């Protein structure tokens, strides 16, 4: 059986209006669209980097 990838839930809790374009790209890269939208993403270094860049906009569960 393949290794089950660890996942984390990320929720957008603040609007992306008026933020840096790079930060907006990170939010979209995580798959988030609207406020209170939650997605489940794989726990990888790339995803962690995107979350750290926009940590003031998101809430993370399942660390």
UniProtKB/Swiss-Prot annotation:
Q: Name one Pfam family in it.
A: Ribosomal_L30
Spell out where the chain crosses the membrane: none
Can you cite a GO biological process for this protein?
A: translation
What does UniProt give as the signal peptide span?
none
What protein family is recorded?
A: Belongs to the universal ribosomal protein uL30 family.
Q: What gene codes for this chain?
A: rpmD
Q: What organism is recorded for this protein?
A: Hahella chejuensis (strain KCTC 2396)
The protein's assembly and partners: Part of the 50S ribosomal subunit.
Q: What is this protein called?
A: Large ribosomal subunit protein uL30
Q: Which GO terms describe its cellular component?
A: cytosolic large ribosomal subunit
Note whether Ribosomal protein occurs among the keywords: yes
Q: What is the lineage of its organism?
A: Bacteria, Pseudomonadati, Pseudomonadota, Gammaproteobacteria, Oceanospirillales
Alphabetical keyword list: Ribonucleoprotein, Ribosomal protein
Keyword S-adenosyl-L-methionine appears in the UniProt entry: no
Task: State the InterPro entries in the record.
Answer: Ribo_uL30_ferredoxin-like_sf, Ribosomal_uL30_bac-type, Ribosomal_uL30_ferredoxin-like
Q: Which GO terms describe its molecular function?
A: structural constituent of ribosome
User: Which chain positions lie within coiled-coil regions?
Assistant: none
């Amino acid at each position: 059986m393949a290794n089950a990838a660890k996942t984390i839930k990320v929720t957008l809790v603040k609007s992306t209006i008026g933020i840096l374009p790079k930060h907006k790209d990170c939010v979209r890269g995580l798959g988030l669209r609207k406020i209170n939208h939650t997605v489940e993403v794989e726990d990888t270094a790339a995803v962690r980097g995107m979350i750290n860049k926009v940590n003031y906009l998101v809430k993370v569960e399942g660390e």
